[in-house]
Amino acid sequence: MKEVLCANVTQHSGVEKDVFGRPGKRQVTVLSVQQWQAACQSINADLVWTIRRANLLVDGLSFSPADVGKQLRIGDLSLEITGETDPCSKMEMAHPGLELALTPDWRGGVTCRVLNDAMIHLGDPVTRD
């Protein structure tokens, strides 16, 4: 995973240059800083968020089942939250206990469908409605 300061996100391919990008309800994965930190604290580890392999990291929001169907706005980008990003065995390979630590309370993040094409930048405002 490579961190970038800006990214083009499209309805056709999700986050541009993502090799897994394609249309559908799991186009973009979004991770919450707060939920990532809670998972890391539960296993006494200080891990970089890119280990999670999520497309985007947002601060100030936590996700739950009540968010499915809501819109997440990042700058000019609108995403529809479609579900939970389930942690997989790759998380366990990245760090012992991480898969289990990401399991409760949607700590693994959410999947989203892209509703409009937009360029997003580090520091863009993030809201959910």
Give the ranges of each region predicted by the language model.
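Short, basic/aromatic beta-hairpin or loop at an interaction surface
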Residues: A45-N55, A94-G108
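Electropositive, beta-rich accessory/interaction domains or terminal extensions
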Residues: M1-K90, M119, D129
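Well-ordered alpha/beta subsegment
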Residues: V110-D129
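Active-site scaffold segments
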Residues: S78-T82, A101-L115
